[in-house]
């Protein structure tokens, strides 16, 4: 899989949002009920929803975040090596001050990490996006 980052607004139309979340100075990842792997918060942008609205909704649904600051970081585009399947979206960074309960219908748990774990749901996308933050000197 190939993943590339772009300046915010370069791609114009977005299908997904990805939220790179930090809580207490650590990376906050979620684990879906149907998987044993870890992932950032994010998902589809609904019809008539802005990327920011989608990011806030997904952040709450998948982490339980109730007090936070959030801002766009970059756009991303990802495609399989054979170019048959791809996705694009806007990436946000969230600094979470307070977590509430997560929706148990979708997520099994959230966990704090010092660094990205090996067992990521999207191993060809997630490290690229976090590395972008490091390159921009914008990590926590």
Place the predicted regions along the sequence by residue.
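Unchanged
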Residues: 45-69, 76-129
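Conserved Nudix-box catalytic region and its N-terminal flanking loop in Nudix hydrolases
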Residues: 22-61
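Active-site beta-strand termini and strand-to-loop segments that position acidic
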Residues: 21-24, 94-96
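Divalent-metal (Mg2+/Mn2+/Ca2+)-assisted nucleotide/phosphate chemistry catalytic cores
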Residues: 136
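Acidic, metal-coordinating catalytic segment for phosphate/diphosphate chemistry
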Residues: 1-18
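Short acidic DE-rich linear segments
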Residues: 139-140
